[in-house]
Regions:
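Divalent metal-dependent phosphate-bond-processing catalytic cores, especially two-metal-ion Mg2+/Mn2+ enzymes
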Residues: 1-13, 41-49, 56-68, 80, ...
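Non-catalytic interface/linker regions that flank or bridge core catalytic/transmembrane domains
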Residues: 1-24, 34-36
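Eukaryote-skewed repeat-based solenoidal scaffolds used as protein-protein interaction platforms
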Residues: 13-17, 72, 116-117, 121-124
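Short, surface-exposed acidic
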Residues: 18-26, 111-119, 174
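Active-site flanking loop/helix segments enriched in acidic
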Residues: 25-54, 83-87
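An active-site-proximal "capping" alpha-helix that borders the catalytic cofactor pocket
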Residues: 50-55, 94-110
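His-Asp-centered metal-binding catalytic motifs of divalent-metal-dependent phosphohydrolases/nucleases
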Residues: 51, 70-87, 100, 121-127
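Polymerase palm active-site segment centered on the conserved acidic dipeptide of motif C
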Residues: 103-127, 131
Length: 227
């Protein structure tokens, strides 16, 4: 087994070891670990850090055209985009976004405060259902929206996404699995980064995987299952 198979790079990103963006994110990570939703089934620490990780990858992709400040604004938005999320399907994601914005306003650092409006605009792009088509957004809003909708492509997606959302939505695992084919089939990436990260063959492979889970879950056991 290789070191890369067991060692994550989140500390590398938070410290900004590669000097990709302005400053570092260590202060915000410490705050994030104290958020009310770090242990939620889906809208948890793993999700918020996964979106941050993806936004870092996008920053690397666009490093020749984005400034270090623009990258930092995106990463701060990613960290806070689900801050204090209640973890329940309430049908009012605008209220969940407001919780995130309140957390940002309360904890934003002095050096980031002049860019509060830009960071807030990026966070607001993650409100679902979407009020504005992704193609009509600015590049930073497009990136965070694509990152936020792409955790299905991680290897731990069944536990994190399927089981996590089933718990938060008070649905069965099969209910959520049945949603995956239409969701993934309608997933469209508009940024060059997103298109390279998740080409259509990758999306198709994930659809087939979700279909496989659905087929197994819909089978009926013919013999009693030992307890």
């Amino acid at each position: 087994m290789k070191i890369a198979d067991v060692q994550g790079d989140i500390p590398f990103i938070l410290r900004n070891d590669a000097n990709l963006y302005e400053g570092n994110l260590k202060h915000y990570f410490r705050l994030l670990c104290k958020a009310k939703n770090v242990r939620r089934p889906y809208h948890n620490l793993r999700h918020m850090l996964h979106v941050t990780w993806l936004c870092y990858q996008a920053s690397r992709f666009y490093r020749d055209t984005w400034t270090q400040r623009q990258m930092r604004n995106l990463l701060v938005a990613a960290i806070f985009h689900d801050f204090n999320h209640p973890g329940a399907q309430q049908g009012d994601d605008d209220l969940n976004i407001e919780k995130a914005l309140r957390g940002l306003r309360q904890h934003i650092t002095v050096e980031d405060r002049p860019y509060l409006a830009e960071i807030e605009a990026i966070i607001k792009a993650t409100e679902y259902p979407y009020n504005v088509p992704t193609a009509e957004l600015g590049i930073f809003e497009q990136v965070i929206r694509e990152a936020d909708s792409s955790q299905a492509f991680s290897v731990a997606w069944f536990q994190q996404v399927i089981v996590g959302l089933a718990d938060e939505w008070e649905k069965t695992i099969l209910d959520v699995i049945k949603m995956q084919r239409p969701f993934l089939s309608n997933l469209k990436f508009v940024t060059e980064w997103g298109k390279q990260m998740w080409p259509q063959d990758v999306i198709n492979a994930k659809i087939l995987e979700s279909d496989g889970y659905r087929e197994i879950l819909e089978e009926t056991d013919t013999e009693p299952v030992p307890v």
